[in-house]
Amino acid sequence: MMASYPEPEDAAGALLAPENGRTVKEPEAPPPSPGKGGGTAPEKPDPAQKPPYSYVALIAMAIRESAEKRLTLSGIYQYIIAKFPFYEKNKKGWQNSIRHNLSLNECFIKVPREGGGERKGNYWTLDPACEDMFEKGNYRRRRRMKRPFRPPPAHFQPGKGLFGSGGAAGGCGVAGAGADGYGYLAPPKYLQSGFLNNSWPLPQPPSPMPYASCQMAAAAAAAAAAAAAAGPGSPGAAAVVKGLAGPAASYGPYSRVQSMALPPGVVNSYNGLGGPPAAPPPPPPHPHPHPHAHHLHAAAAPPPAPPHHGAAAPPPGQLSPSSPATAAPPAPAPTSAPGLQFACARQPELAMMHCSYWDHDSKTGALHSRLDL
């Protein structure tokens, strides 16, 4: 008798078939263990990762979770280190940042200790106006808050000047109207544009006069005074003034002596320029009655004298010795003054005429022929 084995399909079906109508349940995950207080246990921060909170949020968090709602600086440090182990290292850096935020942020108020004593440090608390600066207790999001208006100091109140209601003190000359609405004074204008444009130029000091020019100017002034005292008709005074003017003019064409006013009728012996034209003085007396070529006058000459000593009369086209058209510089009377010799040395024509004057008795014809040229 042979044994029969069941088919594999039937065996698999028998294993999968429920026994007594029961279904097989899959295993479930174990429930989480309850934490303290019946809630879920908070995740511990990673000591190597910096917390995502600003220093203002850390300070506010420490003050709010304190019992008295105020903490000293050391208490804030201890809370941050205990709450976030990341700040156990590099204490110097973040503690300086905590101090700066306490001093510069207006939401933190310093409260002095009661009674003083040996204990140092002040309390820090939150401003009541900044209690809700974080949205719904989220320290990662901070609201934009408007700063409360604080009145300015008394000396900077709007509409008032820096030195009181008058706006001026001690004669400073700044009026109250010159200040703006916030009490700040406009810069004073000490120099106006009109004053700068209408200012007078500074006088320039005159250049010093050379020593030689001073000496000659003094001599010329003394000679002019002597000539004025002697009278305009005196030939000696004119010769003295004219002789003194010669050496001063020799220092340059723009000498100071030439610009000095000379007596009327006196001509400079250097360039023939003098003062305004005036009536010529009467001719001086001569030792002999015949005319000579070196006695020329600027006024109308008398009618020509008849020729003498056998000299022929000049033709009508030639110049006569007494013609007013040839107004040469008048020669001074013969004198022994040194100025006369200097003038003759500077002007060769006058020197020739003076030499011809002294030799006139012997060379009368040669003088007339030389002048006719």
From Swiss-Prot:
Cross-link (Glycyl lysine isopeptide (Lys-Gly) (interchain with G-Cter in SUMO)): K25
First-listed, main subcellular location of the protein, grouped into a coarse class: nucleus
Extent of Pro residues compositional bias: 277-286, 301-318
PROSITE patterns given in the database record: FORK_HEAD_1 (PS00657), FORK_HEAD_2 (PS00658), FORK_HEAD_3 (PS50039)
Keyword Nucleus: yes
Keyword DNA-binding: yes
DNA-binding region ranges: 50-144
GO-annotated molecular function: cysteine-type endopeptidase regulator activity involved in apoptotic process; DNA binding; DNA-binding transcription factor activity; DNA-binding transcription factor activity, RNA polymerase II-specific; RNA polymerase II cis-regulatory region sequence-specific DNA binding
Location of region: Disordered: 1-49, 272-339
Modification Phosphoserine, positions: S33
Pfam families: Forkhead
Maturation and modification: Sumoylated with SUMO1; sumoylation is required for transcriptional repression activity.
Source organism superkingdom: Eukaryota
Cellular compartment(s): Nucleus
Entry GO terms, CC: nucleus
Keywords attached to this entry: Differentiation, DNA-binding, Isopeptide bond, Nucleus, Phosphoprotein, Transcription, Transcription regulation, Ubl conjugation
Gene Ontology biological process terms, A to Z: anatomical structure morphogenesis; apoptotic DNA fragmentation; cell differentiation; extraocular skeletal muscle development; ovarian follicle development; positive regulation of apoptotic process; positive regulation of DNA-templated transcription
Annotated S-S bridges: none
Sequence ranges of Basic residues compositional bias: 287-297
Subunit structure: Interacts with ESR1. Interacts with UBE2I/UBC9. Interacts with SMAD3. Interacts with DDX20.
Function: Transcriptional regulator. Critical factor essential for ovary differentiation and maintenance, and repression of the genetic program for somatic testis determination. Prevents trans-differentiation of ovary to testis through transcriptional repression of the Sertoli cell-promoting gene SOX9. Has apoptotic activity in ovarian cells. Suppresses ESR1-mediated transcription of PTGS2/COX2 stimulated by tamoxifen. Activates SIRT1 transcription under cellular stress conditions. Activates transcription of OSR2. Is a regulator of CYP19 expression. Is a transcriptional repressor of STAR.
Protein's name in the database: Forkhead box protein L2
Gene name, Swiss-Prot/TrEMBL: FOXL2
